[in-house]
């Protein structure tokens, strides 16, 4: 067994009894002890309860019980998600002693599916940066090069996966916080559609908030393979518990089964965000292969530009972020705006 194996592979080994949940947990704890001092990805551990749950998972498997698709899998979650009984800080010093009384909804779903959540991974202050540092736990380093950042804000999540400290993670994303760390650390990350995964129990907002998601933050998995992302989404996606009577996540079967029957639209690029040659070549190769397989492939323009899309994003982002600013900060920003060039069109200034 290698700690670079995918979560899907490890789950199968657990089911085949090639390794026990207790053994797999200890392998990860040993790995954390060996390399985490240099990476600083895992910042909080819950070893005793994790060992108890791992033993229970093994006993259940021996009796033929099935806890779910993640039965016995040890994993960590971003320190933005409340985990009952474990310090959850959101990277904020004012929450350094916060111990939740209940799980965030994503943690509820993971544990209900059989996962063993044994620790938390580092975040920047309020998950608001593209690096990973806070005053409580310090800086997280990229496991491939300790002098480099893993990105942020789910930098601890991505670094832990890349470093062999956990096989699966759940981060959050508003402006790249899953995707950037996944890219920097060479792992897989997915930002799902808005509200596909419940975000209740994420910090911010403040601890204990039970309100529904009114931001543009989404929860998203990080892993070592695309199959693992699908596995995680099969557990995490769906309506909030308060909405389960209102809708369900059941899509109709696809209208076509053969590739030749599909029409595929390709948006090859946009001047606002030019592609690197290697990426453009890969898209063209994929387009050519689809056409060779009989699909009807057409280049299209969606009717809006990435510049328009970027402006809209920053308007939404600024509105969300500013709601949490103290009045003094808002007053200072207004003063800066008065002194700025009126011809500046950047939405981050407006």
Which role fits each region the language model picked out?
Residues 1-51, 292-294:
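An N-terminal boundary/leader segment
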Residues 21-26, 55, 275-302, 325-337:
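Acyltransferase
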Residues 28, 50, 72, 78, ...:
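Conserved hydrophobic/aromatic pocket- or pore-lining residues that grip, position, or stack substrates
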Residues 48-58, 114-115:
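Long amphipathic alpha-helix in the N-terminal Rossmann-like dinucleotide-binding domain
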Residues 60-135:
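Acidic/His- and Gly-rich active-site-bordering loop/insert found
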Residues 70-90, 258-267, 318-350:
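Short helix-loop capping/hinge segments that flank enzyme active sites or metal/cofactor-binding pockets
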Residues 102-233:
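Short glycine/serine-rich loop segments
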Residues 191-281, 285-287, 304, 331:
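A short helix-breaking turn/cap at a secondary-structure junction
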